[in-house]
Every structure is written in C-alpha cells, then in structure tokens.
C-alpha cells in the first residue's frame, strides 16, 4: 500500500513537472511581450509629446521620423477627430502585457467588427478608423 501511494505521488510529480526548455521558452516569450508593451507605451507617450508641440494636426498619420526614432515593426498610429489610435496586430499575451505596462489603462482594447472592446469584452463605444483591421490591439488616447 505504501509503495502504491509513493508511486502515485512520484507519478504526479513527473506528470506536473514542466521541462526546463518549456520554462525558458515561456520566459523568453513573456520578456518579448513585455518589451513590446514597453515600446508601445513609449510610442504613445512620444506621440502625445509631439502633439503638444503640434496641436494643429487633428487627422492623419504621424511619421515615426517625427519622434526621432526608427519605426517599430507592425506598430502604427493614426489620428482621427483629434484622437490618437496606436495599433498593432494582437498576439497571445500582448494585451495582458500592455495592461500591466499601462497600469491597467481603460484605453487598451481589441478591434472586433470595427468596434473597440476592452479586456473584458465590453464595447467601449468607439468606432475605429478604416485603416485599423479587426483583431488589432489598440491603445487609444
């Protein structure tokens, strides 16, 4: 009986153990997503600083060269009706990372049927510009 319990216990430990390669891959992915979220927050902060000095622009795209840094792959902005939309393709875990970096901002959402939904799936009552595709992750300001 004792050996049976011991074998069940050891079997459970072996079954629930995650290999070191999986842990490393998960940590790398989390680090990449966190870095992407940090870049996104910096990007929108630079846009806000730029808009403070250029209040006349209410619509269009602000070129990344205006911020003095090189473009980030798949990270875009568009101004519409004096509102900034920073958007990028969503990927698993990116919304959580962006929420963590933005201190759980209510201005982070995902585009579904041209509407912006928050992290709980609630409609934020915002129609997004035509250039933002469904499934994109948006940081609104």
What are these regions (language model features)?
Residues 1-14:
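Glycine-centered recognition micro-motifs in short, flexible terminal segments and loops
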Residues 3, 43, 52, 85-87, ...:
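Sequence-level detector for tyrosine residue identity
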């Amino acid at each position: 009986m004792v050996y049976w319990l011991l074998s069940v216990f050891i079997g459970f430990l072996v079954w629930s153990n995650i290999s070191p390669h999986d842990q490393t891959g998960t940590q790398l992915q989390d680090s990449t997503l966190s870095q992407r979220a940090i870049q996104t927050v910096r990007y929108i902060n630079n846009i806000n600083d730029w808009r403070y000095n250029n209040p006349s622009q209410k619509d269009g795209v602000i070129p990344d060269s205006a911020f003095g840094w090189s473009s980030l792959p798949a990270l875009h902005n568009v101004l519409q009706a004096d509102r900034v939309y920073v958007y990028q393709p969503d990927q698993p875990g990116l919304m959580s990372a962006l929420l963590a970096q933005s201190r759980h901002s209510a201005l982070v959402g995902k585009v579904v049927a041209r509407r912006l939904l928050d992290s709980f799936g609630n409609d934020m009552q915002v129609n997004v510009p035509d250039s933002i595709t469904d499934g994109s992750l948006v940081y609104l300001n």
